[in-house]
A protein has these predicted regions:
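Conserved P-loop NTPase nucleotide-binding/switch module
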Residues: 1-62, 71-77, 82-86
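Flexible loop residues that form catalytic
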Residues: 65
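NTP-binding/hydrolysis catalytic cores, primarily Walker-type P-loop NTPases
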Residues: 72-141
Length: 141
């Protein structure tokens, strides 16, 4: 609800943050956050909320819940990363732009897709860019 607007204000401090919401996809999460921000009052338009979200959020990691049944009938619930999108400033009509970094694959972990240039700094923290590109290229074959 309206606490999403407060979340943006906290994120704008630039000290880093992590937040959760429930949605069917990463794009749906962004749409939901826009709607939640608008619940803060008439002063928050969808355009303002979308623009501020595009500046405040770097990544959306969507987690799915898989239900499986073993051959002996034992049921298991397992969470897996379904997709990761990079969020950036977008066109005037939407306010933010989404770039799919890891895309959904049915019954499998998300597959590497595209690494935006601004995320290359992750290499300084142990992210293997060469492996990412090799896997992304292999997934497209």
């Amino acid at each position: 609800g309206p606490e999403a607007w407060l979340m943006i204000k906290a994120m704008e401090s630039g000290s880093g943050s992590l937040s959760t919401t429930h949605a069917a996809s990463a794009a749906d999460a962004m749409d939901k956050l826009v709607t939640c921000c608008m619940e803060a009052g008439r002063h928050v338009s969808s355009e303002l909320a979308a623009r501020k979200l595009g500046r405040a959020i770097d990544l959306v990691v969507h987690i799915r819940l898989d239900n499986t049944i073993d051959v002996d009938g034992t049921r298991h619930r397992r969470r897996a990363v379904s997709e990761i999108v990079a969020v950036g400033q977008g066109e005037v009509d939407l306010g933010y732009a989404l770039t799919t970094v890891f895309s959904p694959v049915p019954n499998a972990p998300a597959s590497p897709t595209l690494l935006p240039d601004h995320l290359r700094v992750l290499a300084h923290h142990g992210f293997d860019i060469d492996t990412f590109h090799a896997q992304a290229t292999g997934a497209r074959r």
